[in-house]
């Protein structure tokens, strides 16, 4: 009865579209824990042991796990075997992955591959052998992570494994881990000739990653009419892949766009030790289950703490006020402090300006799923350096309009800011050169025509 419940649980897990499949064994995160630890603490429902990186002459590699050997030199991993059984009792599906990016593996012919199927079944499956690396633990299937572009024998191997599976007393699975370019150069024949259960597609280290030329449709078309489940393969951190790591907001956007695909099975991760760091794995699970949506951003922001920067002995201070509105279909614009009264005040201004006409805080409006009313925030008063006639003397009043700011809050929005600064005569750089925006300052320049205005002013005053 208990065995039947476990089998039913395993079947329901692999049929779900909210699965996390995680590779374990290569310590990509640098502090790999035991298999049992991850089964108990992580939301992963499928864990793939990596790797059986040598065959037909067997060689296992689990990085900092498993140091025992049989007399033949084959790895003897009793702890992993014990953990496999514990994981399976918790409803986890455990696969053994063949291949990897490095290793010494491959077949010279289909017949050699068919013969090797018996070795896999007897040493890791439901068969019998005097040297079983995981003792009496039986894996739930095999994964083909072939990356050497030699496709000889793998379709024959998988076909023969299916025959062995049919004699077993539980469900077994076959999977592949293709690179995202379709068709894959190493397992393309296998995937076209054999019915597989899962494809853990590596959408990283290639041009077809999520933030580039994402090609899910190519794989979805391949899966049409098949029972295979496609997994969105991601690196667990920026250090666990050469390229292709993306933030949670990108994953959420992509998952939302493909979750309705009947072939979508979930997310696969390389690898679990790196994805556990910082809680990324749990965030991915929440994104899949629908509970990981970011909180709606506030529609107004208080000004940043004034920033003070010094260049060439001159000091400048500025505060940025942001007002964001979310109104579908509207437009956006910006204004700066540059009216007539402000100009007149700058001619005879003291260190504190008394002008009451100031720029309206900039409002940016853009479409979002949940519109809210736009708000405004009072802008700070502009200041001007003392006795600043036409920019002839010590200071120059500069009005700076920032370019578009793309907010880091997890929503699709565009924010515009208006920034008013008072700068010294030697102030040449933007106050915000280290920020996530680019400011272009345009200072008031002395025009030669003003020289004609001085005699006229003297005549009027006399």
UniProtKB/Swiss-Prot annotation:
Its main location: secreted. Residues 1-17 form the signal peptide. The keyword Hydrolase applies. Its EC number is 3.2.1.14. Residues 18-291 form the GH18 domain. GO terms for molecular function: chitin binding; endochitinase activity. Keywords: Carbohydrate metabolism, Chitin degradation, Chitin-binding, Glycoprotein, Glycosidase, Hydrolase, Polysaccharide degradation, Secreted, Signal. It is an enzyme of class 3 (hydrolase). Glycans are attached at residue 57. Gene3D superfamilies: Glycosidases. GO terms for cellular component: cellular bud neck; extracellular region; fungal-type cell wall. GO terms for biological process: chitin catabolic process; polysaccharide catabolic process; septum digestion after cytokinesis. It is found in: Secreted. SUPFAM superfamilies: (Trans)glycosidases. The active site is at 147 (proton donor). It catalyses: Random endo-hydrolysis of N-acetyl-beta-D-glucosaminide (1->4)-beta-linkages in chitin and chitodextrins. Belongs to the glycosyl hydrolase 18 family. Chitinase class III subfamily. This is Chitinase 1. The gene is CHT1.
